[in-house]
Design a protein with these regions (language model features):
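Terminal transmembrane helix and immediately flanking juxtamembrane interfaces
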Residues: 1-219
Length: 219
């Protein structure tokens, strides 16, 4: 059907193109509007992951310049509205930008958000097991995240934007940053710095002689 080819397929491809930009900008806007420290930490971690991935890619290009790929700032592989605007800021309209073979900043961004969400399900396992947060919601989020990852990886590889090696390395790099970043922040802040869901935290009172979980501050 023409509508599927001309509109739905094009809309899907464009949304996949700008997916990392959408996640980054959405998180940054929420951090500004809500002034919520946990959202600010998530946004800062995402931006830091992108910067670190780009730095690693620059080192790869420095030691293996032949592996770099030239791309136009208007290329579909450059990114969406944020990526293209950033590219145009430092380059004339169609000037080529050099991209490393690995790691993929695109996949690193998706890996960061996915792994950070997975880390939260472990950090707040006691609350989830106690029914404070519905488990079916987490399962649904996990399924959606997996589908998006597969679609994004397929899109980038089929479009020639990434090699399979670069995409997987970027995904693992971002996942490591998201997971360990969340775990470290949770340990440093008593799990309050990662409580994006705003769920009441439970405290183990076994050491006090009672096998009861209660909300902190209500003893």
């Amino acid at each position: 059907m023409p509508i599927i080819k001309d509109y739905l397929a094009a809309a899907l491809l464009y949304n996949l193109q700008i997916l990392p930009d959408s996640l980054i900008m959405g998180t940054v806007v929420l951090a500004i509007l809500l002034t919520n420290p946990t959202v600010v930490a998530l946004a800062a971690g995402a931006l830091g992951t992108q910067a670190l991935t780009h730095a690693v890619g620059s080192l790869v290009m420095a030691y293996q310049p032949d592996s770099a790929v030239p791309r136009s700032s208007l290329d579909i592989c450059t990114g969406g509205y944020v990526g293209q605007s950033w590219a145009r800021l430092f380059r004339p309209g169609t000037a080529h930008l050099w991209h490393p073979l690995a790691p993929s900043v695109y996949m690193a961004t998706l890996g960061y958000f996915t792994a950070a969400g997975g880390a939260l399900s472990q950090i707040y396992k006691d609350e989830i097991d106690a029914g404070v947060w519905p488990r079916h919601t987490l399962i649904a989020c996990g399924v959606v995240s997996a589908i998006l990852l597969v679609l994004a990886l397929t899109f980038r590889y089929a479009s020639g934007c990434e090699s399979l090696f670069g995409a997987v390395i970027g995904l693992l790099f971002g996942a490591a940053a998201g997971y360990f970043g969340a775990v470290i922040l949770a340990a440093a802040t008593g799990r309050r710095g990662t409580n994006l869901w705003g769920i009441p935290l439970l405290r183990d009172r076994i050491n006090n002689g009672s096998a009861v979980y209660i909300c902190p501050g209500r003893t």
